[in-house]
Amino acid sequence: MEHKRLLKVRRRQKARKPEFRRYCWNKKLRLRNKSWRRPRGLFNKLRKRYGGKWSGRIPVNVGFGSPKAVRGLHPSGYEEVLVYNPADLEKIDKERQAVRIASCVGMKKRLAIEDKAKELGIKVLNPSG
């Protein structure tokens, strides 16, 4: 019950969280999709939090994280486990964990994994077709 409430809280927090863009992300194409890096320049206005660079931007700060109990979980509330073959399904706890089939697995083995998961009652996060 507590898990469901915390997942709702996390969803609300993520909706309000700003996009933390790296400094000069709009000037260099290679920085477009990169993750946040703290500005370390001696005269950097974003680091000093003043000037035109700072206005309207929020640097990464404490308080934007999700609740610790649900951090890293899939939005459905399950813990993701990467599976490569049907034998890996034996180690799965179906109440807490869900399966994601690895991208390097071929169609034949993927179908075998899905059949065995259905038989064991395990949720597959990326089923075929």
From Swiss-Prot:
Annotated keywords: Ribonucleoprotein, Ribosomal protein
GO CC term, one of those recorded: cytosolic large ribosomal subunit
Organism domain of life: Archaea
GO molecular function: structural constituent of ribosome
Residues annotated as transmembrane: none
Family annotation (InterPro entries): Ribosomal_eL32 (IPR001515), Ribosomal_eL32_arc (IPR023654), Ribosomal_eL32_CS (IPR018263), Ribosomal_eL32_sf (IPR036351)
GO annotation, biological process: translation
Pfam families: Ribosomal_L32e
Homology family: Belongs to the eukaryotic ribosomal protein eL32 family.
NCBIfam families: PRK08562.1
Name assigned to this protein: Large ribosomal subunit protein eL32
Biological source species: Archaeoglobus fulgidus (strain ATCC 49558 / DSM 4304 / JCM 9628 / NBRC 100126 / VC-16)
